[in-house]
């Protein structure tokens, strides 16, 4: 199960195959955004995790949890990000997004 949750979603893979130029342009934009400021990769993933939590989008939460782990953020640090979100987005939304994070973190 762990390998299934850590791999890229089929929807993403099929999109990049169907629209390689758009996918490449998006990756270029993402790279320029990462390079545009002083935050290191680890901090960038935590910021984007917070945005994903606030957006309430399951795919985004899954993606940012995976990227945070890949950047060296510990599972406990990721869980702490969800606790910090609680007072900003409310308990029910935090619980929903935390459930999505645990899809990936439960095997870490």
Task: List PLM regions with ranges.
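Acidic, glycine/proline-rich low-complexity segments that act as flexible tails and inter-domain linkers
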Residues: 1-44, 70, 94-108
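Short alpha-helical scaffolding segments that buttress acidic/His motifs in well-ordered protein cores
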Residues: 26, 46-53, 81-88
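Residue-level micro-sites within transmembrane alpha helices that shape
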Residues: 44-47, 63
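Mid-chain, well-packed structural core segment of small domains
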Residues: 54-83
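C-terminal structural segments of small proteins and small subunits
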Residues: 79-103
């Amino acid at each position: 199960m762990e390998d299934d949750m850590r791999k890229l979603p089929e929807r993403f893979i099929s999109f990049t195959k169907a629209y390689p130029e758009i996918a490449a342009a998006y990756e270029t934009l993402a790279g320029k955004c990462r390079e545009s400021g002083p935050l290191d990769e680890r901090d960038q993933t935590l910021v984007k995790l917070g945005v994903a939590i606030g957006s309430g989008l399951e795919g985004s939460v899954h993606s940012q949890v995976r990227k945070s782990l890949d950047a060296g953020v510990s599972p406990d640090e990721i869980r702490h990000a969800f606790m910090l979100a609680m007072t900003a987005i409310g308990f029910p939304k935090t619980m929903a997004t935390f459930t999505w994070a645990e899809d990936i973190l439960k095997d870490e």
